Amino acid sequence: MDIEYELIETYGVFDETESGWTREVNLISWNGREPKIDVRTWSPDHSKSAKIGTLSKDAARKLGQILVRITE
C-alpha cells in the first residue's frame, strides 16, 4: 500500500544529519486526510522519511521554539 502525502507548509528545520537528512516541523496531509503538524526526519529530496526517536538538547530547544511560534 502506497502512502500519499502533501506537504502544505514547512514551519522549520531544527536539526540536520551529516548525510543531509533534516528534522523538520511541517503541516502535512496524509492520504488525503485533514492536515496535521508533523515532526519527522526527511531525506534531502523529501522522498523518504523516518520518525524521530531521540533529540539532542539543542535540537529539542529549537523544536520547542518552532512549536511556540506556530501555536501563538
Role assignments for model-derived ranges:
Residues 1-72:
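Positively charged, low-complexity terminal tracts
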